[in-house]
Design a protein with these regions (language model features):
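Helical "substrate-binding/catalytic lid" subdomain
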Residues: 169-292
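Residues in the short beta-alpha loop(s) of Rossmann-like NAD(P)-binding domains
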Residues: 36, 70, 143
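Hydrophobic beta-strand scaffold residues
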Residues: 30, 50, 119-120, 161, ...
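Rossmann-fold dinucleotide-binding core
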Residues: 100-178
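NAD(P)+-binding Rossmann beta1-loop-alpha1 motif at the extreme N-terminus of oxidoreductases
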Residues: 1-66, 92, 97-98, 128
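Hydrophobic residues within alpha-helices
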Residues: 19-20, 39, 108, 153, ...
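Rossmann-like NAD(P)(H) cofactor-binding subdomain of soluble oxidoreductases
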Residues: 54-59, 63, 71-136
């Protein structure tokens, strides 16, 4: 067992369930909550306790990790009826692993501080497969001492941990990373479409690309699945669109103009309107292919 061995997870979707699985298999005591209880109940077989509210998760935990849809959901589980702050006790810390606007994150952290609860923002790069293997990249914002006191927990789920500074820093970096990913998926989709239009094999395109300086994790790992039409989701197109909304909102808050982010947002929205929202985000290839024909 660990000295800080009681962990709570609020939000047991694909990523939350994978993080929970990793922590359970690493010997932590885990209490979980999800608004749709069935998604939390499936973790019982691995030894998790299922709570009836965020308040009950907080009461049972040293560290509560929130992995929910957006800032509004973070607010609700934090400060709403039977929220985390209602379960406050000495030593409780919250780590938000959602993807939200860094400005909102700072505001939420301030509310937590006023309630006497330290909050870290701890968004991650990587999906469920990386979470279960402890290979996430964790980006941390918040009080450094609080982070260092809980670093062993983050080391359990992540192979690389970056402490970035004040609250909101982790979420700002996460948005920059997801903007990069959304663009890579689009550019790879257009390149595959161009190659096919020229009557060439996309497999050869990928082999050439991955033989050069310009290869990426996406071209190596996602590219072969894309050309086979395998869009089983690890992160849905609809979720990427939600993050692009957040990216554009953050840019506005920072008084920045990001024209490619705006264009990407529109393209992903158009793909959703074409019924592709539940595909993996790389399913944007389906939309690019369809709309490329004149």
């Amino acid at each position: 067992m660990h000295s800080l061995n009681k962990i709570g997870i609020i939000g047991t979707g694909m990523l939350g369930s994978a993080v929970a699985t990793r922590l359970l298999k690493s010997g932590y005591q885990l209490t979980v909550y999800n608004r749709t209880r069935e998604k939390a109940d499936r973790l019982k077989t691995l030894g998790a306790s299922v709570a009836d509210s965020p308040k009950d998760v907080a009461r049972s935990s040293d560290l509560v990790i929130t992995i929910v849809k957006d800032a509004q959901a973070v607010e609700a589980v934090s400060f709403g009826k039977d929220g985390i702050t209602d379960g406050k006790h000495d030593g409780l810390v919250v780590a938000d692993m959602s993807t939200i606007n860094p400005v909102s994150s700072k505001e939420i952290a301030k509310k937590y501080t006023e309630s006497g609860i330290p909050m870290l923002d701890t968004p991650v790069m990587g999906g469920p497969a990386q979470a279960e293997k402890g290979e996430l990249v964790v980006m941390v914002g918040g009080n450094q001492t609080v982070y260092e006191n809980h670093k062993k927990i983050f080391d359990t789920i992540g192979s690389k941990i970056f402490y970035l500074g004040e609250n909101g820093s982790g979420h700002a970096m996460k948005l920059a990373m997801n903007l990069q990913i959304s663009m890579l998926a689009l550019s790879l989709s257009e390149s595959i479409t161009l190659v096919r239009g020229a009557g060439l094999e996309p497999e050869i395109f990928l082999e050439i690309l991955n033989s050069t300086y310009f290869k990426t994790g996406m071209s190596v790992n996602k590219g072969p699945r894309m050309i086979k039409g395998d869009f089983k989701p690890t992160f849905t197109l609809k979720m990427m669109k939600k993050d692009l909304d957040t990216i554009n909102q953050a840019a506005e808050k920072f008084n920045l103009s990001l024209p490619m982010a705006r264009l990407a947002n529109k393209l992903y929205q158009d793909a959703i309107e074409n019924g592709l929202g539940e595909l993996d985000y790389t399913g944007i290839l389906e939309f690019v292919t369809k709309t490329s024909k004149k």
